[in-house]
Amino acid sequence: MQKLLIILILFCILKFNVDVEGRTATMCDLPECQERCKRQNKKGKCVIEPEMNIVYHLCKCY
């Protein structure tokens, strides 16, 4: 029972560290982005847009 409690506490600590340090909401896959924009006869580019404490990696077609 104690081992299970220790594992649960460690999991919560690690989860908290990831939430604090890595606040990335979405990831942009450049090849997929370029392919999607190519269908619209545009060029695709991954851009970073910060909003409050979260960073968004979005696909933009130009």
Swiss-Prot record:
One of its GO terms (cellular component) is extracellular region. The record marks Y62 as: Aromatic residue of the functional dyad. Its main location: secreted. Keywords: Disulfide bond, Ion channel impairing toxin, Neurotoxin, Potassium channel impairing toxin, Secreted, Signal, Toxin. The record marks K45 as: Basic residue of the functional dyad. One of its GO terms (molecular function) is toxin activity. It is found in: Secreted. Disulfide bonds join C28-C46, C33-C59, C37-C61. Expressed by the venom gland. It comes from the Eukaryota. Residues 1-22 form the signal peptide. Has the structural arrangement of an alpha-helix connected to antiparallel beta-sheets by disulfide bonds (CS-alpha/beta). Belongs to the short scorpion toxin superfamily. Potassium channel inhibitor family. Alpha-KTx 23 subfamily. May block potassium channels. This is U10-hottentoxin-Hj3a. It comes from Hottentotta judaicus (Black scorpion). The lineage of its organism: Eukaryota, Metazoa, Ecdysozoa, Arthropoda, Chelicerata.
